[in-house]
Amino acid sequence: MPASRTKKAPSTHVPAAGSAREKLIAAAIATVRYKGFSATSVDEICQAAGVTKGAFFHHFASKEALAIEAAGAWTDIAEQRIFTQPDWTRIPDPLERLLGHIDFRLSMLDGPAEDFTCFVGTMVQESYNSSDPIRAACDASIRTYALRLAEDIQQAIDIYGIASGVSAVSLAYHIQAVLQGAFILAKANGNPVIARDSVMHLQRYVIMLFTQK
């Protein structure tokens, strides 16, 4: 039986400063990560953002339109918080940098699932068959992440080689698949430990690919 835990309000910070549009995007990301896209209403997003419903429809024609723009904003957040700011990005050796990336993702798996789960991964699980524009926006965000990570993987392959049949892009997508699956396991189990175990297995697998050529 999944471990139980006390539910709380969305914990992702919605900035007090910024335009109404920025507040709505931040509120959408926080609320969808907490309760899912379908269960999130425009009224809840407006309340979390501290703006009126009129302001919402001034900036966005629909909840779907906001979701699409928020997916792009999520891509920008990932670029800064995952690929630019952390110390692992400055490790000189590309293989060590790749392993540093996985270590960093492992370190993020703590606390309630809404604090570490993927916004676009959450949305696309619900909307892949009901909103093609949302599906495409989520795909673009996930693809951007994979291609960004593939740059480091390719540099590591160029230096160390890799197991036969493995490309940088395919491995980057596999890393994404493990992470997204780990988020789902943590949500189902109610505990991030199971997700951490999955990412630790991922790290062992990546090391094996570069040592068993």
Locate each region found by the language model.
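Amphipathic alpha-helical segments used for helix-helix packing
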Residues: R97, G111-A136
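Amphipathic C-terminal alpha-helical segment
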Residues: M108, I175-V193, V206-K213
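Hydrophobic alpha-helical segments that form the core
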Residues: F116, G121, V166-L185, H201-Y205
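N-terminal intrinsically disordered/low-complexity leader segments
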Residues: M1-S19, I157, Q212-K213
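All-alpha amphipathic helical-bundle segments outside canonical DNA-binding/catalytic cores
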Residues: P92-E96, A136-S141, D158-H174, V193-D197
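Hydrophobic alpha-helical connector segments
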Residues: E69, F83-F116, A168-I175
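Hydrophobic alpha-helical bundle segments that form small-molecule/ligand-binding pockets
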Residues: N129-I134, R143-L171, M208-K213
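Helix-turn-helix
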Residues: P2-S4, K23, A27-A65, E69, ...
